[in-house]
Structure formats: structure tokens, C-alpha cells
Design a protein with these regions (language model features):
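Alpha/beta-hydrolase-fold enzymes
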Residues: 91-209
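Active-site glycine-rich loops that stabilize anionic/oxyanionic intermediates
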Residues: 1
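Catalytic nucleophile-loop/oxyanion-hole region of alpha/beta-hydrolase
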Residues: 21-55, 75
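Noncatalytic linker/hinge segments flanking ATPase motor cores
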Residues: 30-33, 55-61, 140-152
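Conserved alpha/beta-hydrolase
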Residues: 5-25
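Generic hydrophobic, aliphatic-rich segments that mediate packing or membrane embedding
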Residues: 4, 34-41, 61, 65
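Short C-terminal domain-edge/linker segments immediately following a structured domain
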Residues: 18-24, 48, 86-87, 130-143
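Primarily recognizes the serine-hydrolase "nucleophile elbow" in alpha/beta-hydrolase
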Residues: 44-47, 52-125
Length: 209
């Protein structure tokens, strides 16, 4: 559905549209397995189809994925996913791409999603419990755009703290399931407040230069 793919093909370039085993199911996604799938596509392009050079073109999250893939293909270090699942990338023999093209790429999933977290939420089980001084959408919050450097630093720190609280809870839940002999059980939960990046309200935070 990306216009760049059709445009490249119409211009005479050979294009392979790669998708992972997680298409449409990001809630179950393990990025290390996506790297494995991308590696299989590159290997197939070179070994079966006979292409001498393969250039990765990553759009949005595909950009950070492409860079992650290339780094692990050249200098493999990741032996498991953060949850302890997923393939050992050091054993896969990933083939480095011959070039990378980044299209509207963000820096990473974890970085982007953390920067979107509503830092004011204090209780994951009750998102109405908030720190009013961090609530971007509270008209009574004295911290309004343009934001001060001090407020932005405090807000970003609170976002990271919230991320770590959620992560600690998730790891604890996974440990509970493993201890109960049910490591493959699914346990869904909602992360509230995921549209609260100060740059959306204050253009000076991330100006388009």
C-alpha cells in the first residue's frame, strides 16, 4: 500500500515487499523473529533469485527494523528477546544488506512508544489517577506550551519511569505464568494514555527543519 513500492517498480527497479509472520498482529510481535524473517527474505533474494545486491528500504518502523537487522547481521549480539523468547540472532548467519534506504523512519519502536506515553498516569489499573502537573491535556495545568526545558526534562523522565513500571509488571506476570507451568498463556492488558507527546502541542520541541 506504500506508493514508493509501485513507483520503484514502474521505474524499472526490482522490488520485493517483505512481511513478517506477525502481519496484522503487532500485539504478539517479537522483533527478533521479525529480524529472522527479514533475513530469510534477503537470503532467498540472493540464493534462490540470484540477486547480487539487495538494498533494504525501510518505511516508518521498517526503518529502525532495517538498521537493527543490519547491525545484527554485521555484529550479532542479541541472543534472546527482552522476554527471554525469540531466536538467538548470533546463530542465524544473517546476510548484511548491500545498502539501506530510510523513508520517514522513526528511531525505534521502544523509543517512539515511550515518547508517546502519558506521563501523568500514576496507576495502570486506574488511569484517572494522574499527576495534574504532568497532564498535557489538563487546561488547569500551569505547564502550557511553549514548554520550558525543565518541564520537558521532568516529563520525559516520568515517561521512562512509567515505561519501567509497566515493564516490571509484565516481567513479573511472565514469571508467574512460567512458575505456574503455563508459559504459553496469553494475558492481555491495556496501556492507557498513548497519545501524549509534548512535540504534538509545542512545535518548538521538534521543529521541522
Amino acid at each position: 500500500y506504500l506508493p514508493m513500492i509501485n513507483a520503484l517498480a514502474r521505474a524499472g527497479h526490482h522490488v520485493i515487499y517483505c512481511n513478517s509472520r506477525f502481519r496484522g498482529t503487532d500485539s504478539a510481535l517479537l522483533m527478533e523473529k521479525v529480524v529472522q524473517d527479514l533475513g530469510a527474505a534477503i537470503k532467498d533474494a540472493k540464493d534462490r533469485l540470484g540477486y547480487a545486491k539487495v538494498v533494504l528500504a525501510g518505511w516508518s518502523g521498517g526503518g529502525s527494523l532495517s538498521m537493527f537487522y543490519q547491525q545484527q547481521a554485521q555484529h550479532p549480539t542479541v541472543t534472546a528477546s527482552p522476554s527471554g523468547d525469540g531466536p538467538d540472532l548470533t546463530t542465524l548467519g544473517l546476510i548484511p544488506a548491500d545498502g539501506i534506504m530510510l523513508l520517514a523512519a522513526h528511531i525505534s519502536r521502544h523509543g517512539t512508544l515511550t515518547e508517546w506515553l502519558d506521563a501523568s498516569i500514576l496507576d495502570e489499573s486506574d488511569p484517572t489517577r494522574r499527576d495534574p502537573g504532568l497532564d498535557l491535556y489538563n487546561p488547569d495545568n500551569p505547564n502550557q506550551p511553549p514548554y520550558s526545558a525543565e518541564f520537558l526534562a521532568r516529563y520525559r523522565e516520568a515517561q521512562i519511569d512509567r515505561n519501567r513500571r509497566i515493564t516490571a509488571w509484565v516481567k513479573g506476570k511472565l514469571a508467574e505464568l512460567r512458575a505456574a507451568g503455563r508459559p504459553d498463556d496469553e494475558f492481555g492488558f491495556v496501556v492507557h494514555g498513548t497519545m501524549a507527546d509534548p512535540r504534538w502541542l509545542d512545535p518548538a520541541v521538534d521543529p521541522n527543519d
